[in-house]
């Protein structure tokens, strides 16, 4: 190792900063977070530091640097653009065996600042030993995405409970197993949902040997296909799953992000070929959770938009199973954005309506009169099979047969296809589109030719012949 990683306790310790500009201000912000007592040596201060001085947050020595200013200082940072001054600060500190950092000048550093992921009291520090700071920053960003923000609560509660756990468990191995179970089980799940009191109750039950073998269900929206649209929260929950129930709308790229040793069960349904009934899926969620497993129900798009997620959670709730919901990017938002079709536009559409092509068998007919009105966008899910009836009803109720339409197949994926035509051609377009497909009806479709951005540039065809844009 070029550097030994250390965590320094700076609370109320004097730290000297030489320099009063923006770079100094960035370092001072870190020092404040660590509770340091900051002294600044500079002839002038930036407006930000001037305000901190007025607020009493820093001490200011409005003079030139002198070596004796290092007396009784814990460490020093030189943050000026004067290389001679910076070298003098380092030399004086080195002579006194005081840790020194000259910003962006590694040879003049006896310590360096790492990239930091702050989940205090849990702190992760990453360093490239000054060789590749951009790489360290990229790794920090990846860890920021993977580490839940609630880790700070988890670490704080664990700190408060260490003494009690030690009193109950004399063996270090026993204590280690206790915390391993807590950090990967129901205690961690409760923390992630912000249920801190319940989480501490769970620790108490575990200490008393009353831990219930009860799992939980997480309803997670997988988004429309592109794995990059999966939410950070969704990724974190998927990485903790014991078993994942997924449907056919979940892309392989998203499934690849599931924890490697998690069991995967396909409960997908297709029109006319339901491989698993909804009732069987509902019961399976309950059964698996009652076995103490962390169950993820992974649904394409958003689970509460035509995904029957509400029905599934009603059954889970009635069984007394804990659950949580992680929203996802719904297909109408994701697919249209990737196709360059805004759902609303000041000049073309003041409203948007989401419609499902799969209606309840005993449901009322749609309000076609309202849907046929102009200056609105219709986004129809699972509507390819009924495209002919949709077109006929809208035209019969007053919508122009030349209204622009788009059928977006496999939206947001690398093989996305966008088919453009008119309302009269909707059935033909739907027959050509790969599934899953979204129907979009309204004048906003015309903007596709101007602002399509994903994959190849749009290919404009005549209004008579539908255009196909293959974005593979």
Swiss-Prot record:
CDD domains: SUMT
Function: Then it catalyzes the NAD-dependent ring dehydrogenation of precorrin-2 to yield sirohydrochlorin. Finally, it catalyzes the ferrochelation of sirohydrochlorin to yield siroheme.
Catalytic activity: uroporphyrinogen III + 2 S-adenosyl-L-methionine = precorrin-2 + 2 S-adenosyl-L-homocysteine + H(+); precorrin-2 + NAD(+) = sirohydrochlorin + NADH + 2 H(+); siroheme + 2 H(+) = sirohydrochlorin + Fe(2+)
Binding-site positions, S-adenosyl-L-methionine: 224, 300-302, 305, 330-331, 382, 411
Keywords: Cobalamin biosynthesis, Lyase, Methyltransferase, Multifunctional enzyme, NAD, Oxidoreductase, Phosphoprotein, Porphyrin biosynthesis, S-adenosyl-L-methionine, Transferase
Residue ranges of the region described as Uroporphyrinogen-III C-methyltransferase: 215-472
Enzyme Commission no: 2.1.1.107, 1.3.1.76, 4.99.1.4
SUPFAM superfamilies on file: NAD(P)-binding Rossmann-fold domains, Siroheme synthase middle domains-like, Tetrapyrrole methylase
Binding site for NAD(+): 22-23, 43-44
Family: In the N-terminal section; belongs to the precorrin-2 dehydrogenase / sirohydrochlorin ferrochelatase family. In the C-terminal section; belongs to the precorrin methyltransferase family.
Annotated region described as Precorrin-2 dehydrogenase /sirohydrochlorin ferrochelatase, given as residue ranges: 1-203
Modified residues (Phosphoserine): 128
Name used for this protein in its record: Siroheme synthase 1
Molecular function in Gene Ontology: NAD binding; precorrin-2 dehydrogenase activity; sirohydrochlorin ferrochelatase activity; uroporphyrin-III C-methyltransferase activity
Any GO BP: siroheme biosynthetic process
Pfam families assigned to the protein according to its UniProt record, in alphabetical order: CysG_dimeriser, NAD_binding_7, Sirohm_synth_M, TP_methylase
Active site, renumbered: 247, 269
InterPro entries assigned to the protein according to its UniProt record, in alphabetical order: 4pyrrol_Mease, 4pyrrol_Methylase_sf, 4pyrrole_Mease_sub1, 4pyrrole_Mease_sub2, CobA/CysG_C, NAD(P)-bd_dom_sf, Siro_Cobalamin_biosynth, Sirohaem_synt_dimer_dom_sf
Pathways involved: Cofactor biosynthesis; adenosylcobalamin biosynthesis; precorrin-2 from uroporphyrinogen III: step 1/1; Cofactor biosynthesis; adenosylcobalamin biosynthesis; sirohydrochlorin from precorrin-2: step 1/1; Porphyrin-containing compound metabolism; siroheme biosynthesis; precorrin-2 from uroporphyrinogen III: step 1/1; Porphyrin-containing compound metabolism; siroheme biosynthesis; siroheme from sirohydrochlorin: step 1/1
């Amino acid at each position: 190792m070029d550097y030994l990683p250390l965590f320094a306790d700076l609370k109320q310790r004097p730290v000297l900063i030489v320099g009063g500009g923006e770079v100094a201000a960035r370092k001072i912000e870190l020092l404040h977070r660590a509770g340091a007592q900051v002294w600044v040596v500079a002839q002038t201060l930036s407006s930000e530091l001037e305000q901190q001085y007025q607020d009493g947050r820093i001490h200011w020595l409005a003079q030139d640097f002198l070596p004796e200013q290092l007396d009784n200082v814990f460490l020093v940072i030189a943050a000026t653009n004067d290389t001679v001054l910076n070298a003098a600060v380092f030399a004086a500190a080195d002579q006194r065996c005081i840790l020194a950092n000259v910003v962006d000048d590694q040879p003049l550093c006896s310590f360096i600042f790492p990239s930091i992921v702050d989940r205090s009291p849990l702190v992760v520090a990453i360093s490239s030993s000054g060789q590749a700071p951009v790489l360290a920053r990229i790794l920090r960003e990846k860890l920021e995405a993977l580490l839940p923000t609630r880790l700070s609560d988890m670490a704080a509660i664990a700190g408060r409970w260490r003494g009690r756990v030690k009193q109950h468990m004399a063996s270090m191995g026993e204590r280690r197993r206790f915390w391993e179970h807590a950090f990967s089980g129901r205690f961690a799940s409760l923390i992630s949902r912000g249920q801190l009191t319940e989480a501490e109750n769970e620790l108490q039950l575990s200490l008393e040997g009353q831990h219930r073998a009860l799992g939980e269900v997480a309803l997670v929206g997988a988004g429309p296909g592109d794995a990059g649209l999966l939410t950070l929260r969704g990724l974190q929950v998927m990485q903790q799953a014991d078993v994942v129930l997924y449907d056919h709308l979940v892309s392989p790229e998203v499934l690849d992000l599931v924890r490697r040793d998690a069991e995967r069960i396909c409960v997908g349904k297709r029109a006319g070929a339901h491989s698993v009934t909804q009732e069987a899926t509902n019961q399976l969620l309950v059964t698996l959770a009652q076995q103490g497993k962390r169950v993820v129900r992974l649904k394409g798009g958003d689970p509460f938009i035509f995904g029957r997620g509400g029905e599934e959670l009603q059954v889970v709730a009635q069984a007394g199973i804990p659950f949580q919901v992680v929203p996802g990017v719904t297909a109408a938002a994701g697919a249209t954005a990737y196709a360059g079709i805004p759902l609303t536009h000041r000049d073309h559409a003041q409203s948007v309506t989401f419609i499902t092509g799969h209606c309840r068998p005993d449901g009322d007919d749609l309000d076609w009169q309202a849907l046929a009105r102009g200056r609105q966008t219709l986004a129809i899910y699972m509507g390819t099979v009924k495209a002919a009836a949709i077109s006929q009803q809208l035209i019969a109720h007053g919508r122009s047969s030349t209204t622009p339409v788009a059928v977006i197949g496999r939206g947001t994926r690398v093989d996305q296809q966008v088919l453009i035509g008119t309302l009269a051609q909707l059935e033909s377009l739907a027959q050509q589109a790969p599934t899953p497909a979204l129907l979009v009806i309204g004048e906003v479709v015309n903007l596709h030719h101007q602002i399509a951005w994903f994959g190849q540039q749009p290919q404009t065809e005549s209004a008579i012949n539908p255009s196909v844009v293959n974005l593979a």
